[in-house]
Amino acid sequence: MKYNQYAYVETSPEKATEELLAINFLPENYSSLSFSELLAVLTGNVLAEATTRQAKDAKLAEFAVDDQTDLAAFLLDTPTAITASQFANVALQLLGYHPNYDYSLTDPLTCGEKHALPAFKDLTSKEELIFAFYRLLNTRSKNGQILLDVMAGKGYFTQFWGEGKFMLFNGKSLPVFDTSQVIREVVYVQSDLDTDGDGKGDLLPVTIFRPVESQDQLKVPALYTASPYFGGIIDNVKTNHNVDENLTDATTWTNPKYVAKPLVKSPAPSGQDVPATELATGQSSYGLNEYLLARGFASVFSGAIGNRHGDGIRITGSPEETISQKEVIEWLTGDRVAYTDRTRRFETKASWCSGNVGMTGRSYLGTLQIAIATTGVKGLKTVVSEAAISSWYDYYREHGLVIAPSECQGEDMDKLAEVCQSNLWDGGNFTAKKAYEAEQAELLAAQDRATGQYSDFWESRNYRHHADGIKCSWISVHGLNDWNVKPKNVYKIWQKVKQLPVESHLFLHQGPHYNMNNLVSIDFTDLMNLWFVHELLEVENGAYEQWPKVMIQDNLEADKWHAESDWANDLGQASLYSPTADGYLSTVENGTGQLTFTDLGGTEFKKAGISETDWEYQFISGEKKWAKASLRFESEEFLHPTTLVGRPKVQVRVAANKTVGQLSVALVDLGTRQRLTATPKIFARGNQPFGYRFEADSLQEFVPDKATKAKLITKAHMNLQNYQDMKQPSKLEAGQFVDLEFELQPTYYTLPAGAKLCLIIYSTDQGMTKRPLETEDYTVDLAGTALLLYRK
């Protein structure tokens, strides 16, 4: 598998020598050393676990230069050069590869090529040797980290602990901060909000992990993770809403309104600055933050309103939620008051903070980055938003229907608020409990699970309509197989952000609702190190030009990434397909006639007792038990690999035999073959240290799985009563044909030669839609039905 490397910054030999000297890797007297002496010293310096020169020299015999000679013996002959093969053998062993197991000592260059390592060459001078080691230190090891990070995990950089300054190498920050003495503290930011109605501004607990070096003169930037889960998660899955119910006439919709909560203006910060008096007992919950904490970036967490030990109530997705999370940044930049404890007597300042703030986090944590960025708050320099919601309607609804996130059937705004209302665990917080119960009733009514229609309530939770307020640089990360936060969320915010005068990048991986910072196929963590150094330390390191604007992981070969200028329909050519009465999906023949299927609702699914995931696979694979409740149309086999891009669109002329109805459409890749695993395989658990005796991550990647019959590419759902307007339901008569036109979730998917594309038209999606208790007939007029794709 290829260890692709995008974060290595091309560096001159002169600059490389300077950087090697700065980290004490290249000895000051290197010019007086012979080639063989320098080779011994540099190899020994990689072995950070050996703390004396004698110990380092003793370990040289453990390394082979070929299948006959160890390095110590090789050096006895005082060589003045080393061949590409010999150096490759030593380098591969330093990188963690095992000779005779991972590769052959007689052919190390093939191993390097296999894993996309930098090319090895003959080294005939000390200058070449020095630069070769510089490149080696910046090369990804078998554990996925660059060799310099492996050395850090063995204690190499403890020699710099206490110096109180950032050190850079190849444009990235080094782990020179003492992780054994991290300051862990809690402060209470006062909000302008009074969401619990007690007449006082809500206090928002904020947890800070920062380098001990920031106690003195060093000011450090902050990585802020707005995490509603940080205070704890209330498990309420057993109380999720019932979805086994019939559809409701959507014309009963009343357009529920958003109602703002009262404000209580907080006092301006005074000159008082008392050190924090509460120790943090919570743990960092985001690996990228831990990695960068060892490299000098403070890590800040807050769940804001409604979180454990704080005030207020959770109001999922609301402007109040955005305001409260934004207020933490205002404290970090000196514009808001915070206190040492809940008595509000002693102010404390983020005097350790440089005023430059970046944001990190996935899912809800990524969502709040989008929300805060739209406010244009001062000090927020960049966001790295992963698997984020850009409109809450697109999370819990779709085209006039109640639609669940994957594996979250019955969840909704009120239930998520309950999950995150961790201050309910504070037994004495009676104010929050009373306000919470009232808010739950309001959320239940306003979210309108009866009709699923767009409303003012949902409009207030659509961050995309405030995208013009974004002033910071932007990175979005999303899984193309994320059916929790569906890809529409990142696609639609990307269409806005890419037009703004800010630097922006997009990563699309093959995962579901997953992080990508520890994949074999891409050095994402190193890229983010480079990025945050540029944005928060304000060092010009070429980060903006270092990698393509859009990077997309291939669905056939996990170690292949596509460089694109954009992610949009424009990447491909439009192709129109028509379903025909004999079950074909044709580009040359128009469909005629009518076909009918009977939707069974959720009754058979409940009887089967299988999971929603198992149902979906059996359904898309065409198992008769489930496929009979659908219409399926298959293309001819593709003669050449074909990549689908952007958002497919369907037009369906359909009639139902009831006055309500829901239509689902799926695009499926058919053909029995190996496909990538749904989630990455862990190669070695806990093998990526973030620093010396600190936290760690695990190397993982998608790998070929057992053969399957089919794979879902994309899908979408629509309420038949929105045939005239996506935001306004209309009356529907039984038997009335209506023309539905809607887009599917966006994709970037390659169909290999020999695959077939299958269009499935159905109604009940057991994992996402409501599951009616009654059957319903749907008749599709093929003459008014078509599929528009964009193909590369």
UniProtKB/Swiss-Prot annotation:
Query: What reactions does this protein catalyze?
Result: Hydrolyzes Xaa-Pro-|- bonds to release unblocked, N-terminal dipeptides from substrates including Ala-Pro-|-p-nitroanilide and (sequentially) Tyr-Pro-|-Phe-Pro-|-Gly-Pro-|-Ile
Task: Provide this UniProt record's keywords sorted from A to Z.
Answer: Aminopeptidase, Cytoplasm, Hydrolase, Protease, Serine protease
Q: How does it assemble?
A: Homodimer.
Keyword Lipid biosynthesis in record: no
* Claim: Hydrolase is one of the keywords in the record: yes
**GO terms of molecular function:** aminopeptidase activity; dipeptidyl-peptidase activity; serine-type peptidase activity
Q: What does this protein do?
A: Removes N-terminal dipeptides sequentially from polypeptides having unsubstituted N-termini provided that the penultimate residue is proline.
Enzyme Commission designation: 3.4.14.11
Entries under NCBIfam families matching the protein: PRK05371.1-2 (NF003781)
Source species: Lactobacillus delbrueckii subsp. bulgaricus (strain ATCC BAA-365 / Lb-18)
- Its domain of life reads Bacteria
Pfam families linked? Peptidase_S15 (PF02129), PepX_C (PF08530), PepX_N (PF09168)
**What is the protein name given in its UniProt record?**
Xaa-Pro dipeptidyl-peptidase
Question: In which family does this protein belong, per the annotation?
Answer: Belongs to the peptidase S15 family.
* Residue numbers annotated as active site: 363, 482, 513
